[in-house]
Swiss-Prot record:
Protein name per Swiss-Prot or TrEMBL: Uroporphyrinogen decarboxylase
Keyword set includes Repeat: no
Transferase keyword on record: no
Reaction catalyzed: uroporphyrinogen III + 4 H(+) = coproporphyrinogen III + 4 CO2
One term of GO molecular function: uroporphyrinogen decarboxylase activity
One example of a Gene Ontology biological process annotation: protoporphyrinogen IX biosynthetic process from glutamate
Pathway: Porphyrin-containing compound metabolism; protoporphyrin-IX biosynthesis; coproporphyrinogen-III from 5-aminolevulinate: step 4/4
Name of the gene encoding the protein in the UniProt record: hemE
Organism, scientific name: Shewanella oneidensis (strain ATCC 700550 / JCM 31522 / CIP 106686 / LMG 19005 / NCIMB 14063 / MR-1)
Top EC class for this record: lyase
InterPro entries: UROD/MetE-like_sf, Uroporphyrinogen_deCO2ase_HemE, Uroporphyrinogen_deCOase
Length: 354
C-alpha cells in the first residue's frame, strides 16, 4: 500500500498534533455534484452504482478532485447489510428505500442469517480495495456502517419512517424479538467493518441516524449497547497504525458521556450540540467531529466563513477536532459554497494548532 501523504484526519481522531483542523463532509460524494449525477445516470440507478466497484470508486474520488479534503469515504449505503440478509432492498422514487420482506415478526428474525462480507457483500469489499489503490496514499479512506438500531428501524418498518411505530411497538411489547435482531445485526456489522479494514479502510464510522428517536433509557438498551458490542469486536490496528472508530448518533447530544465510555476514538456531533460544551464534557476522552448545520451552505460565502470561525473558536486550541457538517450535505447546495467551506476550515484553523 502507498504511504499516506496526508494523515491529518487520522492524527486528529487520535488526538495527535496536526498543522490545521482536518475537514471532510458526510455525503461528500453525492447529488450536489454534477459529475456524480452523470455517473449515477451511467450506472442506471443508485444500487447499481453501489454494486459497480469501478463506478463506486469514481464517485468516491470525484470530490477529492474538486476540493482539498482530508479524507475519502467509501461510496456505499447503510442498507447494504440488510439487503445482503435477503430482505429485497429497492428504492421508490420520492419514497426512499423500501424492503420487499420486512423483518417485523420473531419468525422472520429467526430466519435471518449473518452475511459473509467477502461473499454477499463482496462488491463493497471490491470497492474498498479499488478506492484504496486509486487513492495512492493521497488521504485516508473511511469505511462505515449503519448502527444496529438504525438498520433495524428500516428492516422492521419496511423502509423509512417518521414515527417508528412498528419498531417501538416491538421494543416495548416484544423486547426479546428486537434484542435477537439487534444482536444479529451487531455481529453482521462487526464482520462487515472488519472486512472493510482488511480490504483497506483506514478509519471506521458507525452512523446511528435514528438513535435520537429513542427515550433516554431505551437509547442505552437498544442502540448504545449494540454499538458497544461492535466497538469491542473491531480490528483497531492495520497497516502498522491504529484504525480510529467514530460513533455518530443524530440527536444524540444527551448521551455524549455514555458514548465516550464505549472505547471509541471520536464522536460525531450534529448541529444541535454546542461544540465548546461537548469538548468540556468529553473532549479529554475522545476526539470530536462536526458540526456545522448543512443548511448553512446555502448562506452567502462570508456567512459560511463566519460560522466556520465560530465553530473553530468554540472548540478552541489543540488537536482532537475533525471539522464536518452536522449531517450529510444537501443535494441543492452550490458546489462553490462547499469549496469555500473547506478552504475556510483550513485557513482559519491554523491559528489553533501552533
Amino acid at each position: 500500500m502507498a504511504e499516506l501523504k496526508n494523515d491529518r484526519y487520522l492524527r486528529a481522531l487520535l488526538k495527535q498534533p496536526v498543522d490545521m483542523t482536518p475537514v471532510w463532509m458526510m455525503r461528500q460524494a453525492g447529488r450536489y455534484l454534477p459529475e456524480y449525477k452523470a455517473t449515477r445516470a451511467q450506472a442506471g440507478d443508485f444500487m447499481s452504482l453501489c454494486k459497480n466497484h469501478e463506478l463506486a470508486c469514481e464517485v468516491t474520488l470525484q470530490p477529492l478532485r474538486r476540493y482539498e479534503l482530508d479524507a475519502a469515504i467509501l461510496f456505499s449505503d447503510i442498507l447494504t447489510v440488510p439487503d445482503a440478509m435477503g430482505l429485497g432492498l429497492y428504492f421508490e422514487a420520492g419514497e426512499g428505500p423500501r424492503f420487499e420482506r420486512p423483518t417485523d415478526t420473531i419468525d422472520a428474525i429467526k430466519k435471518l442469517s449473518i452475511p459473509d462480507p467477502e461473499d454477499e457483500l463482496g462488491y463493497v469489499m471490491k470497492a474498498v480495495s479499488t478506492i484504496r489503490r486509486e487513492l495512492n496514499g493521497q488521504v485516508p479512506l473511511i469505511g462505515f456502517s449503519g448502527s444496529p438500531w438504525t438498520l433495524a428501524t428500516y428492516m422492521v418498518e419496511g423502509g423509512s419512517s417518521k414515527t417508528f411505530e412498528k419498531i417501538k411497538k416491538m421494543a416495548y411489547a416484544e423486547p426479546a424479538a428486537l434484542h435477537m435482531l439487534l444482536d444479529k445485526l451487531a455481529d453482521s456489522v462487526t464482520l462487515y467493518l472488519n472486512a472493510q479494514v482488511a480490504n483497506g479502510a483506514q478509519s471506521l464510522m458507525i452512523f446511528d441516524s435514528w438513535g435520537g428517536a429513542l427515550s433516554h433509557t431505551a437509547y442505552r438498551e437498544f442502540s448504545l449497547r449494540y454499538m458497544q458490542k461492535i466497538v469491542d469486536g473491531l480490528t483497531r490496528f492495520a497497516d502498522g497504525r491504529q484504525v480510529p472508530v467514530t460513533l455518530f448518533t443524530k440527536g444524540g447530544g444527551l448521551w455524549l458521556e455514555a458514548m465516550a465510555e464505549t472505547g471509541c476514538d471520536a464522536l460525531g456531533l450534529d448541529w444541535t450540540v454546542d461544540i465548546a460544551d461537548a469538548r468540556r464534557r468529553v473532549g479529554h476522552k475522545v476526539a470530536l467531529q462536526g458540526n456545522m448545520d448543512p443548511s448553512m451552505l446555502y448562506a452567502p460565502i462570508p456567512r459560511i466563513e463566519e460560522e466556520v470561525g465560530q465553530i473553530l473558536a468554540g472548540y478552541g486550541e489543540g488537536t482532537g477536532h475533525v471539522f464536518n457538517l452536522g449531517h450529510g450535505i444537501h443535494q441543492h447546495v452550490d458546489p462553490e459554497h462547499a469549496g469555500a467551506f473547506i478552504k475556510a476550515v483550513h485557513a482559519q484553523s491554523k491559528q489553533y494548532h501552533k
